[in-house]
Structure formats: structure tokens, C-alpha cells
From Swiss-Prot:
Pathway: Glycan metabolism; heparan sulfate biosynthesis; Glycan metabolism; heparin biosynthesis. This is Bifunctional heparan sulfate N-deacetylase/N-sulfotransferase 2. Belongs to the sulfotransferase 1 family. NDST subfamily. InterPro entries: Heparan_SO4_deacetylase_dom, HSNSD_N, NST/OST, P-loop_NTPase, Sulfotransferase_dom. Gene3D superfamilies: P-loop containing nucleotide triphosphate hydrolases. It comes from Bos taurus. The lineage of its organism: Eukaryota, Metazoa, Chordata, Craniata, Vertebrata. It is found in: Golgi apparatus membrane. The keyword Iron does not apply. Keywords: Disulfide bond, Glycoprotein, Golgi apparatus, Hydrolase, Membrane, Multifunctional enzyme, Signal-anchor, Transferase, Transmembrane, Transmembrane helix. Residues 1-18 are cytoplasmic. Essential bifunctional enzyme that catalyzes both the N-deacetylation and the N-sulfation of glucosamine (GlcNAc) of the glycosaminoglycan in heparan sulfate. Modifies the GlcNAc-GlcA disaccharide repeating sugar backbone to make N-sulfated heparosan, a prerequisite substrate for later modifications in heparin biosynthesis. Plays a role in determining the extent and pattern of sulfation of heparan sulfate. Required for the exosomal release of SDCBP, CD63 and syndecan. Glycans are attached at residues 351, 401, 667, 727, 803. Pfam families: HSNSD-CE, HSNSD_N, Sulfotransfer_1. It comes from the Eukaryota.
Length: 884
């Protein structure tokens, strides 16, 4: 019996183990099936979010307030913009203060020029005038108390400037825990009550500064924070702009003020008290309505000089039509809702039309219901605008062959023709903005040949973030407009699952980022996706709510234009953006990800020889090319061997064209690529363009006596048969007057202007740090080139070090230094170099010595500040000037 039990017991244990394993397997299978069912089954739909309703005036909802009939005093004259630069002076507490950054962000978004200064202490007020012209059109104080408590000398200086030039002041009072609860503002008939909790905000409809702001609505509910300041005054110079009420738990404000009274948190000083107009804020810019009024304040105080008109153009793109996985696409009901909302929006925004971007390959790749939605879109195709993506939604930068890229486009065009989709809008968008910026030349060429594209848009120029820096440009005849995001992406399809919660989306619409995008940009192209119009239809919710909110709170005139007229409108407003500013794609990870892997930033030069002309730059180019670690650009067949990329029409050909002039270095860390274009030095645009594309490049310039340089250029032009140089003496050229022929004045400028050395160097130093700039003594280069080349090699950090004392040899016949060869032979520059000219006449020498005296003095001061040695020729000129 015992033996039998020993046999049966293990068998029962084995069966128990098997049963447990089967139960575990069954549980896992059930969980997997449930997960699959949940993921593939349609979600139980919650009610769709309803857009913001119509505005309703709530002025009667609050109690009495201090809003009184506007006083018609004599207002101070508007800013004399003809006598002031359109620059805003912003006094900040620190470079990192939050309010200061918010002020700057709004100015930058509005494309206004500004200068920030740390709020001065005693006697360090920045210079406010330049001769008889004011430097600033508006003054902003992040901390109003810094203005009020200025020392007497600085305060009088600033106030006198504001009165004389009609300049206004915006100031912010931010209460903190140590602020007095009640106090009079020093020197003003104005009382402040601080650290209050407020509610129920309202706009005073009689405030003179209102332009963008529409005073038709009360904002109910508590205002954020408990650190609000309200203003009180009986003086007629103060007009309330924004008003709120005390929260029930707040103690009453001193004075005869009703409990439910409207209390001013923003006041406008009409200038009756002291002749200076001001707008004072009792809080920062964290509350959205303050941003709106801040823009109005800046516009009013500058006579609308810092204010766009009320027109705002919006275009809503719906990318990825027919693209998307099952369960995220539009169904028939969604298309019907799209049409209904479009019609509603047209009553609010003239000509509003959704702009649909399609990839035909994915037509009918959804569920049966979603395929019916595709058909519904095509049935109503004439009611929308349409633009092409790529046929297979591929990124264009992956196509290196233009014909293959064009074939993909033709497939999409054939699909459009077969289904009656209009193809004449002249607009296209590349998937993921690939190839638009950084430029993929093949994309632009294929777009033009297949579709006749005239305009596109991208969020990547010059960078994705911050969005306020996005700009437009024109390349290869195609207008590239800035594109904006609206917080809706392919994965944001459910209201209650919005990242950060649905309140984040509503906050963006109601005074947040999306609202400010339209407020601060005359033209906004918004990117949305097909999936945003299925499911919870967040695209419809967002834009209907946005439009209604804008019309509640602003006087903006919302409009829609087709892409090509919209592009023309954009560049009419911002003609300065027509020319692009190329940047290094490898300095931005997003740019590198959408840039062809066949391209490399290693082909960009490490240093530039920038001129000026006739100073010895060709000799340096020749000498450097003898170094085994240094490689020059290939010669250009069209611009006298120099590339001349940064200062002429070649710049618009793009960086692919530029990089084709350089080989791929065998070792990017030790090989030095460079180019020499002597016309770069005195160009107004080259330093900015160069620093954008080559921010770490070293810059080499060669300076000789500017009088000798001018004479050399004149003789150079005579040698090349310039009729002006042949028909006029050098003295006639350099002394030409404004009444002389334009051709003569042009030659005069090319002789004289490059010699304004300090002016041009200051421009370079605006964009490059002084440590990246080397100034070579042109006279020493001529007499002792080996010493100059030693300095240049050390500056560039080139290894191995080449001994130019052994490499170079003076050629008596040529009269300058050449490469020494075996057998006593030399290899020299071409016949055009080293020409012998007659000596300059004494009259011209005397004139030029006097003409360049101040320029040379400024150059000496600049070199002293930079810690760079003074060239031998400059010392001689300064000694000669002082002795004369």
C-alpha cells in the first residue's frame, strides 16, 4: 500500500502542475484577446467637444466702477517718428527675468526692433539721442519702480527726452510679499493698492488706446494669482483700461470704494500731468488679456508706428488626406461635419476654405466606413482647395535623382486628374517639410516642372523653435512661407486625451499660443492632419473656437486667401525676407534629419580670405595653397576665379551650389578648406550671411594704406580697359562730386569706400567674435611674407607647420615673392599680378592722406581695443598726420 501511494503521489502532483500551467496559459490568452479587442474595436465615443459660443456683452454683470466719460484734454503730440528710430528701449531687471523675456518675445513676434538694457542705477542712463535724432520710439520698464526711483539727473534726462521727442513709457508694477499694501507712486497723483486677489475682468470701452482689443465682454471668474495691483486717482490724466473686482474674501480697498466696484489694474496716463504719455500695468504679462492690451499700448504710444493693421489672413492646411492607419481616418459623418463647419466659418471669415493635401497612393486603404469617407471627400472636392504631397508620402530629400522624384509627383498628379481634383492651386507641401529647408534642389526643380508650384510653406526656416523666429524666403522662383503649428498632431485625436489635458488646448485657443499666433502675425498658415478631423474632430473644434474667441475679444478682420495671392501678400508686407539666410544644416538636428545623407558639412570652408581688393589677398591664397593641409575652392569660371557666393546673385543658388566648389576632405579634422573672395570685405550683407552659414569660420583680411589701395584699383581698371579710368585722371576720380556722371561716381566709390577699414571691420565684428578675425599687415606681407604666413598658420592652427622662409623666393624680374623650385627656378602668380605703375601724383597723395585721416584714426582705436598690433603703414600715416 505504501509503495502504491509513492507511485500515485507524483502522478497527482504532475497533474496539478499541468492544471496550473493550463490556467496560466488560459489567463494570458484571455488578456491578449481582450487587449486585441480593445485596441481594434472602436472607442466608445464620448460627446464631441462643442466650440466656444457667440460673444455676449456682460457689462451689466458687475457693479459700479470708476469708468467715467473720457476727458478731452489736449493730448501730447504723437511720437515724432521722423525724428526717432523705430527701436524700443526695454529696461529689464536681469537678462533672465521672466517678465523681461515675455516683453522681448512679443516684440520679436511682432518683428519690432528693440534694445535691452539693465535698469540703470545712478548716472548710467544709455545714450538717448544721436545728434538731433532720437534713438528710441518707446521706452518700456519691466519694473516701474526703477523708473520712479531714478536719480534726479537720470530722471530729468529721460523725461526731457520723452517730452521733446513725444516718446511714451510703458511700466509694470509687480507686487511681492514685501510691497506696501497701499502707497502713492512717487512724484505722481496716483495711488497703488497691492497684493490683491481679483475676479471678473472687463475692458473699459472708452479707453483711448484700444485698437486690437474689443471691449465687448466680461471675463468672469478669478484672475490668476493674489499679487494684483490696482490704481486709484482723481486726476484727469488717468484713464482706466482694464478693470476687475475684489474677490469676496479680500479686505476692502481704502477710500470710498463700493465693494463690487470695478478697480483699474491697467491705466493710461494721457500726459496731462507732465506731458508724457504712459501706460501702467498692475501685473505682468502672464494673464493673456495683458498681452493684448500691451500690443495696443505700444501701438498707441508710437502713433501706430508699432502696430499692424487689423487684417489677419489665416489658411488651414489639412495634411495627409487619404493617409493614416485604420481607426484614425475620416468617415462620411466627419466629412459632413467638415463641410458644415466650413460654411459656418465662412460667415465669420470671408472666403474661408479648408486646404487639403493628398497622397493618392493611400486612397481606399482604411476601413469600409473610412473608404466611404474618402469617396465623400472626392464627391465634394470642388468645395475645398487641394494641394499635393508626395504620391507615397515619401520624404523628397531621400530622392537624389530629380527624374525619379518627378515620377512620384506625376503619379500623384495622374491620381488627381483621374478623380477630378483641381491641380492649379500652385501650392505644395513636402511630407515632414523635407527638402524645403534645408534646400533640396531636386525638389524645387521637380515641383516646378510637374506641378508649376509657386508657393510652399515650412515650419523649419530658420528653425522650428522658437516659433516667433519663423520667416519666409524665395528660392528658385518659389515663395516659401512660414508655417505654424496649432497644437494638433497626428496622434492628438481625442479631446480628453490631449497632452496635458483638454485645458491645455483650450488655454492655447483662449488667449494662449494659438491666439497669440494670429494676433501677432498678419499671415498664419496652420498645419493640421486628416486624423484631427475624424474621431473627436479636434480640428473643427479648435478653429471654430479660435475664430469665435478672436471675434469676441479683438477687432481683427479675419480673411482667407488662396496660397499664391497669400504668398504675394506676405512678401508685400515683408519684402526684406525675399532673400534667404542660409544656415549650416549640421547645426540643427531636425535639419540634419531632413537633409540628404549624400551631403556633408565637411565640404564647407574653415576660413575665408575676405579682402579687400588690391591688398595682397591673391598672394596669401597662392602661398596657403602650397601647404599640404590646406585646400582652396575650385576656381569659378564666371567670377574671376573667386566664388563670390555671399555677396551676389550666386548666393540665391543655395549651399549645394556653394559646396560643389569644394572637395570632400580626406580628413575633416586636419584638412583646411578655404575660399578667397576679395569683394566680401566691404559688403554690407556678407558678414551676416557668412556668420549664419559658417559661424565658426576664421576670417582673414589684409589691410594696406587705403590711399595706395585706391590708386592700385584705379590702375587695375585702366589695365582692364575701363573707359572711365582711361578718360579721367586719378585725381579727377577721387575728387568727383555728386554732379558728376554716375559711372565716374561708381569708380570713385570702388576706389575709396573699401578703405573705410574701421567701418567695415565693425560690421564683421557685429557677427564674428574678435578671436576669429585676423588683420594682416599688407606692407609686411609684401616685404616679409614668411613672417606673415607664420602668423596666419598660428591663427588657423594648421599642422604641420610649413617653413615659408624655405618655400618662398624673391623673383627679381617679377618684383615679388614666388614659390621656390629646384634649380633656382620659381613659380609665380600670373602676368596680371605685380604690374609696375607710375607713382601717385603728390596732389592726389595729399588729398587722400587728409581724406582717410579720420578713418585711419578710428582703425587705430579699434585695433587698440581688440589688442591687435597696429600695421606699420598705419603707424607711418598717423605719424605723418600728427607732424603735418
Amino acid at each position: 500500500m505504501l509503495k502504491l501511494w509513492k507511485v500515485v503521489r507524483p502522478a497527482r502532483q504532475l497533474e496539478l502542475h499541468r492544471l496550473i500551467l493550463l490556467l496560466i496559459a488560459f489567463s494570458l490568452g484571455s488578456m491578449g484577446f481582450l487587449a486585441y479587442y480593445v485596441s481594434t474595436s472602436p472607442k466608445a465615443k464620448e460627446p464631441l467637444p462643442l466650440p466656444l459660443g457667440d460673444c455676449s456683452s456682460s457689462g451689466a454683470a458687475g457693479g459700479p466702477g470708476p469708468v467715467r466719460p473720457p476727458v478731452p484734454p489736449r493730448p501730447p503730440r504723437p511720437p515724432e517718428t521722423a525724428r526717432t528710430e523705430p527701436v524700443v528701449l526695454v529696461f529689464v531687471e536681469s537678462a533672465y527675468s521672466q517678465l523681461g523675456q515675455e516683453i522681448v518675445a512679443i516684440l520679436e513676434s511682432s518683428r519690432f526692433r528693440y534694445s535691452t538694457e539693465l535698469a540703470p542705477g545712478r548716472g548710467d542712463m544709455p545714450t538717448l539721442t544721436d545728434h538731433t535724432r532720437g534713438r528710441y520710439v518707446l521706452v518700456i520698464y519691466e519694473n516701474l519702480l526703477k523708473y520712479v526711483n531714478l536719480d534726479a539727473w537720470s530722471r530729468e534726462l529721460l523725461d526731457r527726452y520723452c517730452v521733446e521727442y513725444g516718446v511714451g513709457i510703458i511700466g509694470f508694477f509687480r507686487a511681492h510679499e514685501h510691497s506696501l499694501l497701499s502707497a502713492q507712486l512717487k512724484g505722481f497723483p496716483l495711488f497703488l493698492h497691492s497684493n490683491l486677489g481679483l475676479r471678473d475682468y472687463q475692458v473699459n470701452p472708452t479707453a483711448p488706446l484700444l485698437h486690437l482689443t474689443r471691449p465687448s465682454r466680461l471675463e468672469p471668474g478669478p484672475l490668476p494669482g493674489d499679487d494684483w495691483t490696482i490704481f486709484q486717482s482723481n486726476h484727469r490724466t488717468y484713464e482706466p483700461v482694464l478693470l476687475g473686482s475684489l474677490r469676496p474674501a479680500e479686505p476692502p480697498v481704502p477710500g470710498p470704494v463700493a465693494r463690487r466696484a470695478r478697480l483699474p489694474t491697467v491705466v493710461q496716463d494721457l500726459g496731462v500731468h507732465d506731458g508724457i504719455q504712459r501706460v501702467l500695468f498692475g501685473h505682468g504679462l502672464s494673464f493673456w488679456l495683458h498681452k493684448l492690451v500691451f500690443r495696443d499700448a505700444g501701438g498707441y504710444l508710437t502713433g501706430k508706428g508699432l502696430l499692424w493693421d487689423l487684417d489677419r489672413y489665416i489658411l488651414v492646411d489639412i495634411d495627409d488626406i487619404f493617409v493614416g492607419k485604420e481607426g484614425t481616418r475620416m468617415k462620411v459623418a466627419d466629412v459632413e461635419a467638415l463641410l458644415t463647419t466650413q460654411n459656418k466659418l465662412r460667415t465669420l471669415v470671408p472666403n474661408f476654405t479648408f486646404n487639403l493635401g493628398f497622397s493618392g497612393k493611400f486612397y481606399h486603404t482604411g476601413t469600409e466606413e473610412e473608404d466611404a469617407g474618402d469617396d465623400m471627400l472626392l464627391n465634394h472636392r470642388r468645395e475645398f482647395w487641394w494641394f499635393p504631397h508626395m504620391w507615397s508620402h515619401m520624404q523628397p530629400h531621400l530622392f537624389h535623382n530629380r527624374s525619379v522624384l518627378a515620377d512620384q509627383m506625376r503619379l500623384n498628379k495622374q491620381f488627381a486628374l483621374e478623380h477630378g481634383i483641381p491641380t492649379d492651386l500652385g501650392y505644395a507641401v513636402a511630407p515632414h517639410h523635407s527638402g524645403v529647408y534645408p534646400i533640396h534642389t531636386q525638389l524645387y526643380e521637380a515641383w516646378k516642372s510637374v506641378w508649376g508650384i509657386q508657393v510652399t510653406s515650412t515650419e523649419e526656416y530658420p528653425h522650428l523653435r522658437p516659433a516667433r523666429y519663423r520667416r519666409g524666403f524665395i528660392h528658385n522662383g518659389i515663395m516659401v512661407l512660414p508655417r505654424q503649428t496649432c497644437g494638433l498632431f497626428t496622434h492628438t485625436i481625442f479631446y480628453n486625451e490631449y497632452p496635458g489635458g483638454s485645458r491645455e488646448l483650450d488655454r492655447s485657443i483662449r488667449g494662449g499660443e494659438l491666439f497669440l499666433t494670429v494676433l501677432l502675425n498678419p499671415i498664419s498658415i496652420f498645419m493640421t492632419h486628416l486624423s484631427n478631423y475624424g474621431n473627436d474632430r479636434l480640428g473643427l473644434y479648435t478653429f471654430e473656437s479660435l475664430v469665435r474667441f478672436l471675434q469676441c475679444w479683438t477687432s481683427l478682420r479675419l480673411q482667407t486667401l488662396p496660397p499664391v495671392p497669400l504668398g504675394r501678400k506676405y512678401f508685400d508686407l515683408f519684402p526684406q525676407e525675399r532673400s534667404p539666410l542660409w544656415q549650416n544644416p549640421c547645426d540643427d538636428k531636425r535639419h540634419k534629419d531632413i537633409w540628404s545623407k549624400e551631403k556633408t558639412c565637411d565640404r564647407l570652408p574653415k576660413f575665408l580670405i575676405v579682402g579687400p581688393q588690391k591688398t595682397g589677398t591673391t598672394a596669401i591664397h597662392f602661398f596657403l595653397s602650397l601647404h599640404p593641409a590646406v585646400t582652396s575652392s575650385f576656381p569659378s569660371p564666371s567670377t574671376f576665379e573667386e566664388i563670390q557666393f555671399f555677396n551676389g546673385p550666386n548666393y540665391h543658388k543655395g549651399i549645394d551650389w556653394y559646396m560643389d566648389f569644394f572637395p570632400v576632405p580626406s580628413n575633416a579634422s586636419t584638412d583646411f578648406l578655404f575660399e578667397k573672395s576679395a569683394t566680401y570685405f566691404d559688403s554690407e550683407v556678407v558678414p551676416r550671411r557668412g556668420a549664419a552659414l559658417l559661424p565658426r569660420a576664421k576670417i582673414i583680411t589684409v589691410l594696406t594704406n587705403p590711399a595706395d589701395r585706391a590708386y592700385s584699383w584705379y590702375q587695375h581698371q585702366r589695365a582692364h580697359g575701363d573707359p572711365v579710368a582711361l578718360n579721367y585722371t586719378f585725381y579727377q576720380v577721387i575728387t568727383a562730386s555728386s554732379q558728376d556722371p554716375p559711372a565716374l561716381r561708381s569708380l570713385q566709390n570702388r576706389c575709396l569706400v573699401p578703405g573705410y577699414y574701421s567701418t567695415h571691420l565693425q560690421r564683421w565684428l557685429t557677427y564674428y567674435p574678435s578671436g576669429q578675425l585676423l588683420i594682416v599687415d599688407g606692407q609686411e606681407l609684401r616685404t616679409n611674407p614668411a613672417a606673415s604666413m607664420e602668423i596666419i598658420q598660428k591663427f588657423l592652427g594648421i599642422t604641420p607647420f610649413l617653413n615659408y622662409t624655405r618655400t618662398l623666393r624673391f623673383d627679381e624680374d617679377k618684383g615679388f615673392w614666388c614659390q621656390g623650385l629646384e634649380g633656382g627656378k620659381t613659380r609665380c602668380l600670373g602676368k596680371s599680378k605685380g604690374r609696375k605703375y607710375p607713382d601717385m601724383d603728390a596732389e592726389s597723395r595729399l588729398f587722400l592722406t587728409d581724406f582717410f585721416r579720420n578713418h585711419n584714426l578710428e582703425l587705430s582705436k579699434l585695433l587698440s581695443r581688440l589688442g591687435q598690433p597696429v600695421p606699420s603703414w598705419l603707424r607711418e600715416e598717423l605719424q605723418h598726420s600728427s607732424s603735418g
